[in-house]
Structures are given as C-alpha cells and as structure tokens.
Amino acid sequence: MNKELVLVVDFGGQYNQLIARRVRENRVYCEIVPYTTSIEDIKEKAPKGIIFTGGPNSVYGENAPRVQKELFDLGIPVLGICYGDQLMAHSLEGEVTSPEKREYGKTDVNLDNSSLLFKDMKEKDQCWMSHTDYISKVPKGFKIIATTDECPCAAMENVEKKLYGVQFHPEVEHTLFGKKMLKNFLFNVCNLKGDWSMSSFAEQQIKAIKEKVGDKKVICALSGGVDSSVAAVIVHKAIGKQLTCIFVDHGLLRKDEGDQVEKIFKDQFDMNLIRVNAQDRFLGKLKGVSDPERKRKIIGEEFIRVFEEEAKKLGNISFLVQGTIYPDIVESGTNTSATIKSHHNVGGLPEDMEFKLIEPLRELFKDEVRAVGEELGIPHKLVWRQPFPGPGLAIRVLGEVTEEKLAITREADAIFREEIAKAGLEEKIWQYFACLPNIQSVGVMGDERTYCHTIALRAVTSSDAMTSDWARIPYEVLDKVSRRIVNEVKEVNRIVYDVTSKPPATIEWE
C-alpha cells in the first residue's frame, strides 16, 4: 500500500514533534527529516506536502540552516512556520528584518479568509507568536494574507506554486484556529485523502520487521508497560516464536506487577517469556547512588547486561526490541533540542551494546501507541495501563534507593491507584503515582510525636506527554487517599499533592 506522505523538515524548533502529531491527527502519515536532506532524497520519498518547522536561528546567522532553492520548484506544496516562513522568504529573495522589539505570546491576527489556508475562518483571531525577525518584504509572486500590529507579514502565499508561510505557530493550542489551518493546508492545498490509520501502521511495521529479521532470533525488553507490550505484540505477530521476551524483575516494580506481567504474556499471548529475578543485583548497583541521572544510566546499563547474559544462554540473538516512543527521543535530546533528562530507552544504552535495535513505536505518540494496541487486540485494561518509566520506582524514590523506601512507595502508590480506579478516574487522568521525596517531617499520631516520611502524589492530564497539566482530582478522593496512606503505611505521616504543570516541571520527579 502506497501511503500519502508529508515531510516535516526539522530546523531545530521546540514544537517539531507537535507539528507531526497535528498532521497525524488528520490521518495523514508524516516523517520528520533533517533540513540537510537532499533534493534527491526528497524526490525519492515523493511527499505530497512539506512543512518547514520553526527554529532558534536567524536567516542571517553564519551557521543558519538552509535548504536548496530548487526545493521550491518541485511542484510540492510547502508550508513554512516561523523560521521556516522566514527562510522561504529569504531563499526566494524577499526581505527579512530584525525589529526593535520581538513578538512573543498570544497575539491578535488579521486573516484573509479568501486564502485556501484560512478558508472558513474568522477575519480576526488569536495566534501564538514567538519570533524576533520578521518578513518586511515578500518575494515576487507572493502576497500577504495575515497581519498583526507588530508584524506586517504574519502569513504569505504564492498560490501558483502552492507555497505558504506563517510567522505564528499553528501547531500549539494557543493558536485557536491552528488545527483548522493545518487541515486546510493538508486537504485544500495538498489535496490529501487522509486514509492513514493505526491498522495500516501495524501492517507496515509487521511487514518491515519480517523483512528485517528474516530467520534470525530476537529478544524483547519487556516491562509490562503499554509501550513495551505493544512493541512485543507487533514483533510477535511478525515473527512468532523467533521472539523471546525477557522480563527483568529488578525489584523496582509496582505492587504485584511482576506476577501480572508473567501471567498475561505467557498465558494469554503464548509468548516465549523468561523472567529474570534481579532485585539484589540492581539494588547492589544502586547502593549509595542518589543522583537521578546516574540512577537512570546504571539501570539502563544493567538492563542491557542482563539481556546480553540471557541472550548468550539462548544463543545467536541478533536483535533487541524496545518500546521507545517519540517523547522519549525528544526528551533525550537526540535531535537539535536540549537534553532535559536521559531516557532509559535512549540515553542509558551502553556504547558496546551487542544487539541491533528494533523500535517499532519510535515514531508514535502515546495515544497512537494505545490505538495500535487496540487494533492488535491487546486487552483494553493493559492498553490503558498507567505509563511507568523503565527505571521504575528508582526514580520515584528520591535520593538513595533502599528496600525499605521501595516498600513504602509501593504501598502508597497501590492505595493511590486503587482509589483513583474506585472514583472512575483511571482513564481520565493521563498518569498518576506516588513518590517518596527525601524528606521527613514532624507529626503527631496517637498523642505521640512522629518523625516520618512524606509521600508526594502526582497526577497529570495530557494526550502525548509532551506537555501536561496537573489533574484536578476531587478533594474527597484526595482526602480518602491521604487518610488511607497515613493509616496503612506506618512510616508515613504527611501527604502532599503536586500542582505543577509540564513545563516547567517534568511529569516524573527524577
């Protein structure tokens, strides 16, 4: 099946993956490619449309990203966003100027709704600006189709060549008409059908994995979370018993999780599954370590070492499956964005790893992974299981990890999850968990002074983990959770609730 393709050309902007997500929401497949991609490679991919992302550079910068001018003569519709808009103008002999003051934040914009890009839209609406330079003179053949008080060219078009540029960011929620505008570009300008689906994605992945693997053996890093589970099922459907799932029980799992994982994948999916009990090994490596980055790296390296040892027992293993998804790649700074924290599927990989990687989900956001899981017939409860980091409770126990701290966190987390489920909120909240800050405080219980641990509760709403907001859990639910934890987990005398969004905070505390 030949699928329609849109290329998102990456110039280093912070919203690049969000642009890809917005395209896919319209059932159009897209790929992100670096700005260095050659004209020949673009022709070979035969995209139906191209989107230039924003970026931190000025077109006049010495090392500013460029594209070959011939790209604009291929007859392929192009939409430039922010820096991409300025680059289009600069490349085609328009003029880009640095003003006295920059334009940033929510901004009123005047739209020419006779343009296909702004068809069926209001003449005035709100957009999100984040730029210093702006286009002061459009290239020959272009006309201005949007303005703001500070920006004389907030959008431009060359209808004949199907070239469009916008100075604002249509991909973010603050641009109220942004999704509609992108839809207009995809369907009114590029004339796409929008027939890409999760079932077609799964079919393509299964076919590609069969071709890549051949008759070789594969192991899968199975945690029982949504990502690794869906990755395992895709690969299992492709190669069957050539796949062996290795489930490392590192002692950092949630309550009863190890037994549940073993039961589901052995009994229900009939997979080859090896459960490795490695709690002592991991806790030994983590002894005395409090830095979160070191904890992540240690756990990532130990995971791979365990797999290597198990692979040697199995003999002649060529590939390792991982449940890496898009936000993992973004947060690990593997493109031009800054490293925020290393992800266990990315930054924790030792350089001397002996396997070739299979990462069938690395192009998907979490909600897309769940959709694929449903398509593959994975039980609903597993598909909607809470996201859980590879390092497990090690990054929910702040500071040094000990058996005692793990036990406290595990029990508090189980109570929190149980009460969220009872309240019917488990699919309404993206992620919720308890963590153990390295804090003790004074309390009074039964006329006696206590000096015990504090538990922090974290719950967020999101659709893709790129951004999130703290969940407005009803007070009565929080009250019940608090009372139960304090009464049932004797080492705890204080409960706090985290009311920070992402950004500025990340979802996990470490």
From Swiss-Prot:
Please state every residue range assigned to the domain named Glutamine amidotransferase type-1.
Answer: 5-195
Catalysed conversion reaction:
XMP + L-glutamine + ATP + H2O = GMP + L-glutamate + AMP + diphosphate + 2 H(+)
Which SUPFAM superfamilies does this one have?
Adenine nucleotide alpha hydrolases-like, Class I glutamine amidotransferase-like
What GO molecular function annotations does the UniProt record carry, in alphabetical order?
A: ATP binding; GMP synthase activity
Q: Does the keyword field hold ATP-binding?
A: yes
One Pfam family in the UniProt entry: GATase
Which Enzyme Commission numbers does its entry carry? 6.3.5.2
Segments forming domain GMPS ATP-PPase: 196-385
Q: Which Gene3D superfamilies match?
A: 3.30.300.10, 3.40.50.880, HUPs (3.40.50.620)
Coiled-coil positions are none
Q: Where does ATP bind?
A: S223, G224, G225, V226, D227, S228, S229
Q: Where is the active site?
A: C82, H169, E171
- The enzyme class is ligase
This protein's pathway reads:
Purine metabolism; GMP biosynthesis; GMP from XMP (L-Gln route): step 1/1
Known partners and oligomeric status:
Homodimer.
Q: What does this protein do?
A: Catalyzes the synthesis of GMP from XMP.
Name recorded for this polypeptide: GMP synthase [glutamine-hydrolyzing]
Native source species: Clostridium botulinum (strain Kyoto / Type A2)
Please name the gene that encodes this protein: guaA
